[in-house]
Regions:
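Structural preference for alpha-helix termini/caps and helix-kink/transition segments
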Residues: 264-265, 271-464
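Short phosphate-binding/catalytic loops that engage adenosine nucleotides
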Residues: 58, 132, 450
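Short, glycine/charge-rich beta-strand/loop segments that flank catalytic centers
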Residues: 66-70, 92-95, 105-120, 137-147
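N-terminal, positively charged nucleic-acid-binding surface of large information/translation enzymes
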Residues: 8-11, 17-105, 457-461
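The substrate-binding groove and active-site-proximal loops of carbohydrate-active enzymes
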Residues: 78-84, 108-114, 225
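Alpha-helical recognition segments enriched in aromatics with Gly/Pro capping
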Residues: 1-32, 47, 97, 118-325
Length: 464
């Protein structure tokens, strides 16, 4: 597998340190609001990455944090007259509702910043001892210029960064480029005891600490949204490598933005759509499909027309898979296997792997699934084939969709049995020329959104 490494700006063969435990860290949400679909893109994309690595035989330790103390959380708590804990707990629960709806698997560990204060303080003290950090009136800052490699992830020379840097009112930095590792407590804000007095951690140091505690000083892969490259990930590298004296992450993956009318979606711009409000209208699975339907590095434009297209694409997949179940149930053991068709079905797996091995190209991976759908529709459902052929197609269909994390809302067996019983009654009525009963059952099914279709194997049904 090759991935585009943001650090080197080129595709590289992915060679983890230990194939039995690939160490991946993904930046999680700052929990002060519902997640919008821009937040959901890395959730779904890197969930597919994890699934695919496991599919290819790797063991994966996947860590994704919650930033549960932050200026935005404190601001929200003050506005609502609540504690920061109440705000963070509320939105962690809401996050899980959305993540489970999107079929995003839980990480191996979901650490919280507030649970890792000791580790954070330990790293800051190490940086201070090495001369990379300094304290001023309870604040602690990182000496950016002392890190000779600073800017290597964002590919920005220090001179360019310098021109845009400034010192805010009340800050006592040595240099405008320096950033906060620890913030002295302000009246009414939450705080922890530290060697520098009461305060709380800066955002960047939280991730460095959780990375080191749960994955060690060097990890295989760090991922997140493109907006995190600078300053967040750049600062993580600086802190971690200066404190630990070794490479922080061997590979970096960043997903592109979601745009609304070609402008980046963000909470600060107020042009965002929450996952929850879109899910209420279209369901979570349509959102997941939308988020993985394009290559993860390309920006994607959000509009209702595209969401409708994704809904239709999913319906095609469900229709095909349900029809395949019916064909399998009615396939005759007397029908011989077709070796060429079996080989052609297997070839779709190769096409899928080729796509996904090329920098997690889910767009081409989905195309491979639809090529399989075409073969199923034209060579299996419209013909008489053996049970082995039907089973091979069904197994591969489930295998590939499982890697993508889609088709997780298939009909329940109880509902299937009830509908198929009604279809059988209708068929019996037609055979007995009781067309009034047959029409009544057909109309009842239609009212429930069930569409019937005659095929060589019998009557199949789908949801409208």
């Amino acid at each position: 597998m090759k991935i585009f490494n943001t650090l080197t700006r080129q595709k590289e063969a992915f060679k983890p340190m230990d194939p039995q435990e690939v160490k991946i860290y993904a930046c999680g949400p700052t929990v002060y609001n519902f997640i919008h679909i821009g937040n959901a893109r890395p959730l779904c994309v890197f969930d597919v990455l994890r699934r695919y690595l496991e599919y290819r035989g790797y063991g994966v330790k996947f860590v994704q944090n919650f930033t549960d103390i932050d200026d935005k959380i404190i601001k929200r708590a003050n506005e609502e007259g609540k504690t920061y804990q109440e705000i963070s707990e509320t939105y962690i629960k809401e996050f899980w509702t959305d993540a489970k709806g999107l079929n995003v698997r839980e990480a191996s560990v979901h650490p919280r910043a507030t649970e890792n204060i000791d580790e954070i303080i330990d790293i800051i003290r190490t940086l201070e001892e090495k001369g990379y950090a300094y304290a001023v009136n309870g604040d602690v800052y990182f000496r950016t210029r002392k890190d000779q490699g600073y800017g290597k992830l964002s590919h920005q020379p220090i001179e360019d960064l310098e021109s845009g840097a400034r010192i805010a009112v009340g800050e006592q930095k040595e240099d405008p480029l320096d950033f906060a590792l620890w913030k002295a407590a302000k009246p009414g804000e939450p705080y922890w005891e530290s060697p520098w007095g009461q305060g709380r951690p800066g955002w960047h140091i939280e991730c460095s600490a959780m990375n080191r505690r749960y994955l060690g000083p060097t990890i295989d892969l760090h991922c997140g949204g493109q907006d995190l490259i600078f300053p967040h990930h750049e600062n993580e590298i600086a802190q971690s490598e200066c404190a630990n004296g070794c490479t922080f992450a061997n590979y970096w993956m960043h997903n592109g933005y979601i745009n609304v009318d070609n402008v980046k979606m963000s909470k600060s711009l107020g042009n965002f759509k929450t996952v929850r409000e879109i899910a209420d209208a279209y369901g979570y699975e349509v959102i997941r499909y939308f988020l993985i339907s394009a290559h993860y590095r390309t920006p994607i434009n959000y509009n209702l027309e595209i969401i409708e297209q994704c809904k239709s694409a999913l319906e095609r997949l469900y229709t095909c898979r349900d029809s395949l179940d019916f064909a399998l149930k009615n396939a005759s053991v007397d029908t011989p296997d077709d070796p060429q068709l079996l080989a052609d079905i297997a070839a779709h797996r190769d096409a899928f792997i080729t796509a996904m091995d090329d920098d997690l190209n889910t767009a081409d991976g989905i195309s491979a699934v639809f090529e399989l759908v075409y073969d199923i529709n034209t060579r299996i459902l419209d013909n008489t084939v053996s049970p082995a052929v039907c089973q091979a197609a069904a197994d591969l269909f489930d295998e590939l969709c499982g890697v993508l994390g889609i088709l997780y809302n298939r009909k329940s067996n109880d509902v299937d049995a009830e509908i198929e019983s009604l279809i059988a009654q209708r068929q019996e009525a037609r055979k007995n020329k009781d067309f009034a009963t047959a029409d009544r059952i057909r109309d009842e099914l239609k009212e429930r959104g069930i569409l019937l279709k005659d095929t060589p194997q019998g009557v199949t049904w789908t949801k409208a």
